[in-house]
């Protein structure tokens, strides 16, 4: 016995919530969509777990951070799903999937069939046992991946005020949790094998700024080594950790943030995997055309890099989820997924954003002794990545636009001198293609201003050529087939629109 839906989302994290909103916006019927999640609550914004949820005063709690609060849209509470006819199958683990038969089976033995499946299973936190260290199940050792983890961590922090915490890992989670521990009046030591924090994005210069600030707040850094064992008392509680370099650290609380592993096991042997995730095409389709993958679990083509990448960040989850719904419901009009890699973090009073990739030579700008500074990365003569701490909304938007353009950089010293002004000026020069109402039953897409100078030149040449040909042909007293398109009547306007849109699409593919 089972149930059948048109659309099934497997997983109940960030991506599931954003996909659900997109389905609702596109007008699916009641009863067509279900979300199957092993968590007991409706989809929520996971970034809150390492930020607002851990605050000692006025902490974030549900329903405040249900999706889609992260982009200031409607919060999708359980009531919202009910009102939109979307079935939430919560606290339910899926034990098997058959993509040929289009079914998934739950731990309770129920079979759920679908027409289209979106895999949004995300990832799980890596455990130290996977590196040969036992003891992660001790009562005061925490990971941070879901609401249950965060709730447990809050309880342990409250019991450890004034005590010692050891944070294993120097990435996003480690840095954000360390800040929260300090705010909760706990002494913090961070341990990681790399030479500096957040090594996947930060240069030594950028990392040094944050590390020095953390040190001023009492955080101790132990770099270049890893945890080798826990010291556990007879009650099953960790009292300290031994490090591979031979040192010992007392601990009332240990938080482990050493990375994630994607939840792909249900589909191994059925779908193509690449780089640790489920491989999808530029429409986010897997090797089975009825199955899509989004968020952390997906390995997708990144046009800016020209290769398949996995991007483990909430922004990619949000945008890929919405895109997949569009690709499923409007496949003929949905362009290829063109995502600009984006990462951000907030801790203490700091807030930074990163776009693109940190490849090539770094060019720094701003005041590294203050609160606003940044960096560009230049590779093969083009700006390919950018970072900014303490920017305004407009400055971050300019950073994103400029990085997507990958402008040529001829003078590195001039780029350094201009600093943030470079991307602000560049973004102001880039103009959009608006849709203009021409007063008929349709709208004509009009190229009001060119995105690039050669676009304008090409447009002028093409227009002049067509006009000259039409004039020459008209002089021969023959009807010019182009005239209806150059001077359309209302009845012919739709065809003019169509031809223009086709040419616009072709041009866009070259940009």
Regions found by a protein language model. Give the residues of each.
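Mid-to-C-terminal Rossmann-like scaffold of FAD/NAD(P)H-dependent oxidoreductases
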Residues: 2-5, 297-397, 443-459, 465-470
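FAD-site-proximal beta/loop scaffold in flavoenzymes
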Residues: 137-161, 237-242, 246-323, 411-425
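Rossmann-like NAD(P)H-binding beta-loop-alpha module
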Residues: 148, 152-202
């Amino acid at each position: 016995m089972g149930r059948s839906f048109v659309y099934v989302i497997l997983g109940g994290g960030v991506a599931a919530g954003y996909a659900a909103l997109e389905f609702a916006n596109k007008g699916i019927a009641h009863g067509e969509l279900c979300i199957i999640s092993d968590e007991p609550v409706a989809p929520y914004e996971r970034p809150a777990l390492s930020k607002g949820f851990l605050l000692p005063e006025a902490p974030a709690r549900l329903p405040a951070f249900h999706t889609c609060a992260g982009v200031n849209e409607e919060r999708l509470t359980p009531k919202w799903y009910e009102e939109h006819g979307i079935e939430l199958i919560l606290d339910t683990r899926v034990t098997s999937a058959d993509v040929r038969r289009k079914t998934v089976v739950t731990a309770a033995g129920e079979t759920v069939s679908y027409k289209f499946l979106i895999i949004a299973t995300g990832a799980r936190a890596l455990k130290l046992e996977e590196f040969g260290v036992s003891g992660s199940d001790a009562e005061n050792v925490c990971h941070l991946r879901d609401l249950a983890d965060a709730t447990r961590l809050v309880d342990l922090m409250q019991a450890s005020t004034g005590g010692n915490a050891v944070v294993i890992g120097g990435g996003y989670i480690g840095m954000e949790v360390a800040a929260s521990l300090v705010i909760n009046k706990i002494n913090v030591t961070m341990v990681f094998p790399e030479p500096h924090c957040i090594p996947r994005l930060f240069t030594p210069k950028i990392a040094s700024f944050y590390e020095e600030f953390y040190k001023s707040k009492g955080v101790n850094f132990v770099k270049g080594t890893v945890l080798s064992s826990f010291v556990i008392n007879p009650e099953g509680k960790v009292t300290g950790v031994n490090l591979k370099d031979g040192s010992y650290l007392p601990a009332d609380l240990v938080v482990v943030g050493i990375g994630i592993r994607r939840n792909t096991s249900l589909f191994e042997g059925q779908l193509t995997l690449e780089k640790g995730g489920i491989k999808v095409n530029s429409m986010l389709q897997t090797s089975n055309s009825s199955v899509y993958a989004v968020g952390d679990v997906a390995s997708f083509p990144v046009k800016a890099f020209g290769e398949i990448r996995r991007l483990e960040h909430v922004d990619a989850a949000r945008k890929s989820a919405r895109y997949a719904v569009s690709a499923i419901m409007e496949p003929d009009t949905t362009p290829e997924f063109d995502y600009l890699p984006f990462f951000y973090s907030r801790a203490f009073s700091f807030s930074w954003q990163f776009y693109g990739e940190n490849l090539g030579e770094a060019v720094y700008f701003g005041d590294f002794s203050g609160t606003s500074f940044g960096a560009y990365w230049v590779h093969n003569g083009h700006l390919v990545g950018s970072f900014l701490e303490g920017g305004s909304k407009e400055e971050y938007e300019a950073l994103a636009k400029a990085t997507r353009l990958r402008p040529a950089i001829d003078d590195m010293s001039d780029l350094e001198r201009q600093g943030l002004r470079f991307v602000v000026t560049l973004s102001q020069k880039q103009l959009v293609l608006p849709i203009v109402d021409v007063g008929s039953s349709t709208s004509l897409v009009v190229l009001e201003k060119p995105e690039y100078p050669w676009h304008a030149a090409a447009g002028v040449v093409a227009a002049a050529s067509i006009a000259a040909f039409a004039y020459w042909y008209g002089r021969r007293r023959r009807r010019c087939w182009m005239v209806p398109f150059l001077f359309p009547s209302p009845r012919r306007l739709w065809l003019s629109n169509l031809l223009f849109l086709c040419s616009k699409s072709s041009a866009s593919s070259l940009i």
